[in-house]
Amino acid sequence: MCMPCFTTDHNMAKKCRDCCGGNGKCFGPQCLCNR
């Protein structure tokens, strides 16, 4: 898990990917990084 995901933030998917180093996505309230 990288960081919390907020559905109200339209840039959240990008922030999640960036936080994961380019490979991650929001799953519910969590940003999950793909190994």
UniProtKB/Swiss-Prot annotation:
Keywords: Chloride channel impairing toxin, Disulfide bond, Ion channel impairing toxin, Knottin, Secreted, Toxin, Voltage-gated chloride channel impairing toxin. It is found in: Secreted. One of its GO terms (molecular function) is chloride channel regulator activity. Disulfide bonds join C2-C19, C5-C26, C16-C31, C20-C33. It comes from the Eukaryota. PROSITE patterns: SHORT_SCORPION_CHLORIDE. Expressed by the venom gland. Pfam families: Toxin_5. GO terms for cellular component: extracellular region. Its main location: secreted. Toxin with unknown function in healthy organisms. On glioma cells, interacts with chloride channels (probably ClC-3/CLCN3) and MMP2 at the surface of glioma cells. This complex is then internalized via caveolae, thus inhibiting the chloride channels necessary for cell shrinkage and tumor propagation. The presence of a 'disulfide through disulfide knot' structurally defines this protein as a knottin. Belongs to the short scorpion toxin superfamily. Chloride channel inhibitor family. The protein sequence was deduced by comparison to other short insectotoxin sequences. This is Insectotoxin-I4. It comes from Mesobuthus eupeus (Lesser Asian scorpion).
